[in-house]
Every structure is written in C-alpha cells, then in structure tokens.
Amino acid sequence: MPAFMTLYDESIDPTNRDFYAPGFELRIDGVGLPRGVLRDVMQVTYHDDINEIDGFELTVNNWDATARACKYIGSETAADLGGGSKATQLFTLFDPGGKSAELAIGYSGNFQSMVRATFTTMEPSFPESGPPVLTVRGSNILKALRTKQFTGAWTNQTPSAIARNFNTLRGGSQPRLPSPWKVVTNSQAASAESSIEYVAQKNQYDVDFLLQLAHGQGYTLEADEDARQLYFGPSQSSTPTNYQLGYGKGLMSFKPSLATANQWKSVTVRGWDRQTQKPIVVKVGQDDPQVKKLNSGLLSLVPDRQEQTVDLPVFTAAEAKQRALAIMLDRSKEIVTAHGKTVGLPKLRAGTLVNIQGIGARLSGTYFVTKTTHTLGEGGYITEFDCRREDLGGGGASS
C-alpha cells in the first residue's frame, strides 16, 4: 500500500515553516528575475499531464504608469533592441527562442522545482480598457527532442528496461533519439520495479512515450542539456507526494463522474500465429483475477455488459492475452473520473496518487492523478487536478 500524506502532515513539516505564504522563483538563463519584474508578474500557472509535455504560463503587467509606455513589448524602438541598456534587457527578457527558464513554486523558504523550459510564446494584449498585459508561455526542454513518431510494443519488461531500450532503437539508419542523447536510469529504483505485461507506443514521439511511461510509474523524465542525457526515474529535484484529501479538509471541491456505458463483459482478441499458421483467439473477462482486483467495489454498479471482439496484430497467444488484459484494465480505470481543487500543493503532480475521503463508500478511495494545474495569483495558490479511480484493495472504500 502506498503511503499518503495529509495536509496537517504537510503544514507541520519544518521545511514548510511559512506554509501559508506561497511564492515562486523564476530564473532565466540561470539569473533570477529583478525585483521590479517580479512585481509585474500577476499570475503564474504550471501544468502537467501524463500524456503531454509540461509547461508554464506567466501573466505580466506590461504597462509603466509613470512613463506611460509599455515595459516589455509595444514601446520599443529599433535602437532599443540593438543595445545593451537596461531598457534593451527588459524588451528582450521574455523573447521566445533560445532562453532557458527554471520555475519553482511553493512556500517561503521551500520552493519546489516544477519545470526547466524554454520560452515558446510571447503574446501581448492591448485591450480597449485597462492596461496592456503580456502572456508568456514556456514548454519543457523535452519538446525539442520531438523528431518522428513511431509505433511499437514491449512485453514483460520493467519500465527502466524499456526506457534503456531507446538507446539502441533505430529509425532506419539513424538513432531514434537525436544523437548524442542517451537515456539513463536509477539503478536502485530499477531494482525494485515489477515487469509490465504489455505496453504499446502508438504513433507517438519517443520522448512523449517515455514521459507517459515515467508518469505511470510515478517517475519523471528530466533532460540534462549539458550531458545530453534523459534521466528516467524518481525525481532528482523534488519528490512527488501521494496525498490524502478529505472533502472540507483541504479538498475545496471534487466533481466525480461515474460512467458505465463503455464497460465490457469481456474482450476477445484475435490474431494469427505465423509459426503454426493457425488463428489465435484469446478471451479475457471481468472474472479475470487482475481485472477483478481493480475497482472491484464498483463492478456491481455496471449494468449488463456486452462482449467485444477485436482484431489486432498479435502473433502468439501470450501476446493476445496481454493485449486483452490491457484493454479490460484500461476500461476499468475509466469507471470513475474526477476533477478536484485543493490548496496549493507543489508536490501533487501527474502520476501521483490521491486518497479521497469523506464522499461515501462508492467514491472515496484511491485515485491516479492524470493532470494538474498549479495557479499562483491574487487569489493565492490553488492546485486543480484530474484523476481516475484506481483502487486495488479488492473492495469499496470507507467513507
């Protein structure tokens, strides 16, 4: 059973001595923002997703009321852009392109690293009323490693073994990862991993697949530009945490959706055995031990279900069984999905677990976080998250 931290545990952590004083730190090319620029940042948003590369967005005041001119874009001259003056530095501070940006969010004295990114978009707004505002967006530096999409599958391998496999995969005559990039793993974490019966890369960029694989394990995928390495393993910069959240006790809102229409009684995978030249037919149903174990307390809510048959490119009975099991488990994970809001928790990230309490036996329990949005602004620091029910306890949760 995973360990869960309550908000009380978090509040008494000595490193969070100012738990109620949220803040952020942004370093551009290794240098912190000047104090005047910090005051102009009206809102900071960080987002991550198990299926997407993470990034951030800044909302910045772009108006100097004293000079009656735009600060960062909109009042510059050609001469301003060509010099090394203080004005030039401000006008080019958020320019998209080659600049790196490191964002950390948290509470005074204990900021958590969220992302190392590059600026991708600078979007000024000159409204009909009110002062000009600038929106700046940045994406994880992993985005630069998107080259070509591939399809493939792995059976009975650990996550770290699959990740290391990308060091030898080739797309034609070229390495799949842009040379000289390599994947490195954490040997200690790898030794404790269990094999995954089946996982597929479906017309995805390699870096997107690796990121999804990492999040599914509670890991991160971090790029070291200097060493040209992709680190696959537990976070080296901050530790994602599994939280226990109760409605009215830190959990500000929670909106679950219980959907049973897409649940199947069983799935039959059909393929072709090339060696025996005979058809393959493998069926997995709700009575399979692994399927019964996941969200078993909810299966009684599902009405009479249909049996489904799918034709897939499988060439052994074992592979067909793994594909069928993966399909049934994926369906079970979608019985309950939800959107929640809590106080700002920088360690609550996509790929972690939350234990939701106080909403009844059918809905209380363990959820897997698929997406988070961290917003720090005038209203304080709020974390919103999307999640799906993934209880493995063999029964319903307590309320």
Indicate where each model-derived feature is located.
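Assembly/oligomerization scaffold segments
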Residues: 1-145
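Surface-exposed, non-catalytic interaction/assembly patches
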Residues: 2, 34, 71, 146-155, ...
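Extracytoplasmic
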Residues: 21-23, 39-41, 53-55, 96-100, ...
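An acidic/polar, Gly/Ser/Thr-rich interaction patch typically located in mid-to-C-terminal regions
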Residues: 46, 51-89, 250-399
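A structural signal for the main folded, soluble domain(s) of proteins
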Residues: 101-102, 124, 166, 257, ...
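Extracytoplasmic/secreted envelope proteins and their assembly/folding machinery
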Residues: 116, 160-163, 207-211, 251, ...
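Short, compositionally biased
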Residues: 117-125, 236-238, 367-378
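Charged- and aromatic-enriched interaction segments used to assemble
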Residues: 130-248
